[in-house]
Every structure is written in structure tokens, then in C-alpha cells.
Amino acid sequence: MTKKKRENLGVAQEIDGLEEKLSRCRKDLEAVTSQLYRAELSPEDRRSLEKEKHTLMNKASKYEKELKLLRHENRKNTLLSVAIFTVFALLYAYWTM
């Protein structure tokens, strides 16, 4: 996803979108794998399916890595929000005493 698009989406929305893409990719990978083992294929068809399988595996791996980074970023954002809330709560408690 381009940086400009990322700026317009929240981290949680990006995570949801990537999880959906990863799910579709895994379903496609299952379909290709079942085609490889289900039918008698010509060597050319087999090579084509194996190439597609390899491409899908690489794509899934890329999505998983990006999801890992986004989840880490989401955790950092959550911790920052909790820290800011705690500071405001302490300031409020101090101010009202």
C-alpha cells in the first residue's frame, strides 16, 4: 500500500484490509494446491500451477510480515494512548484535590 493511502487509513483499518487479503490469498493457495494433487496434469500445467503456488506463498508471506509490523505499530499507539490518558487522569486528580 502506498504511503499516501496509508496516511488516510487508520492502523486498525489497514490490519483488517490486510487480513482479508491474506485470507483470500490462503484460499487461492488451497485451491491451487488441491488442483495440483487432484488431477492428472500435463507437465506444462503442473509447472504453471507450481509457479502460481510459489507466487501465492510469497504474497502470503509478505502480507504476514506487513501484518506483524502493523500490529506492532497498533500496540505502540495503544500504549501511547493509555500513557496520555493516565497523565491526564493524574493531572485531573491532582487538580481536584
From Swiss-Prot:
Major location (coarse): membrane
Q: Which InterPro entries match?
A: CCDC-167
Keyword Ribonucleoprotein listed: no
Q: Which gene encodes it?
A: Ccdc167
Please give the GO cellular component terms listed in this UniProt entry: membrane
Q: How does it sit in the membrane?
A: Single-pass membrane protein
**Places the protein is found:** Membrane
- The UniProt entry's coiled-coil ranges are 2-78
UniProt protein name: Coiled-coil domain-containing protein 167
User: What are the transmembrane regions?
Assistant: 78-95
Superkingdom as given in the UniProt entry? Eukaryota
**One Pfam family linked to the record:** CCDC-167
Q: Does the keyword Coiled coil apply?
A: yes
Q: Which PANTHER family match?
A: COILED-COIL DOMAIN-CONTAINING PROTEIN 167
Keywords (alphabetical) are: Coiled coil, Membrane, Transmembrane, Transmembrane helix
Look up and give the organism this protein is from. Mus musculus
